[in-house]
A protein has these predicted regions:
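Residue(s) in the substrate-gating loop at a strand-loop-helix junction
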Residues: 160
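Short, flexible catalytic-loop segment of classical short-chain dehydrogenase/reductase
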Residues: 203-213, 238
């Protein structure tokens, strides 16, 4: 990056791809604002149906510590635009502007065909996986666009292979990830002449807690069963996604 002291914001930063991305950015010299759910919000955690256990404040502190002195934990829910705006304001007030945003917050729920999917599953998958990306993009992009020319900000959303093909019994999750791909395509067109870019990564089966939840939803013994279905013959390591 052109700036001497670049700044990155990562959502879903407590575990998995988000934590790996934060650590990678810190190793490259970025000051990293790690955003994930607060420890003191068990009610919000229990709203997500199914076996997935979202990360919380303790995980977030550990992920920030893994970034050395460059990681700073910020407790916020990506479903809450006001909370995200407050974090972004804090980051800008301390560091001036934002260079990179990684929207990695996500969750998986389902395990039933579409016609048996209840409203809570649908709403939670759209709110977390799609609206969460919209919320952090809307909160952070004005700062990136206000940077003096030549701008070179980067917005990266973590979508899924489900953005390219539907996953049975995960209609809501698949719809949300297709939505992320569409959102980023539109955003990329809007940013075309700004110097700021927007991209999405669409990983397949990655060794994270979300894959454990997916295995449970499909009645698999553990996530290793997905390795047999992977084209590369194994699960993807989160750090491999963070390195892209």
């Amino acid at each position: 990056m052109a700036r001497e002291n670049p700044v990155a914001v990562v959502t879903g930063a407590a575990r998995g791809i988000g934590a790996a991305s934060a650590a990678r950015l810190a190793a490259r010299g970025f000051t990293v604002a790690l955003i994930d759910l607060p420890l003191e919000s068990p009610g919000r955690l229990s709203e997500i149906p199914g076996p997935y256990r979202p990360a919380h404040g303790q995980d977030l502190d550990e992920a920030a510590a893994a970034c050395g002195g460059r990681g700073h934990a910020h407790a916020a829910d990506v479903r809450d635009p006001q909370a995200l705006a407050k974090v972004i304001d804090t980051v800008i007030s301390h560091h001036g502007s934002i260079d990179v945003v990684v929207a990695a917050a996500g969750a998986v729920a389902g395990g039933a065909p579409l016609w048996e999917t209840d409203d809570d599953v649908w709403r939670s998958m759209i709110d977390i996986n799609l609206t969460g990306v919209f919320n952090i993009a809307r909160a952070s992009l004005p700062s990136m666009l206000d940077a003096p020319a030549p701008r070179n900000g980067r917005f990266v959303a973590v979508a899924s292979a489900a953005a390219h093909h539907g996953l049975p019994q995960l209609a809501a999750y698949s719809a949300a990830k297709h939505g992320v791909a569409g959102l980023v395509k539109a955003l990329s067109a809007e940013l075309a002449d700004s110097g700021v870019t927007a991209n999405a990564v669409c990983p397949g089966s990655t060794a994270t807690g979300m894959l454990d939840a997916s295995a449970a939803l499909y009645g698999m013994k553990n996530r290793d069963a997905f390795a047999d279905q992977a084209r590369i013959g194994r699960l993807i390591d989160p750090d491999e996604i963070a390195a892209t």
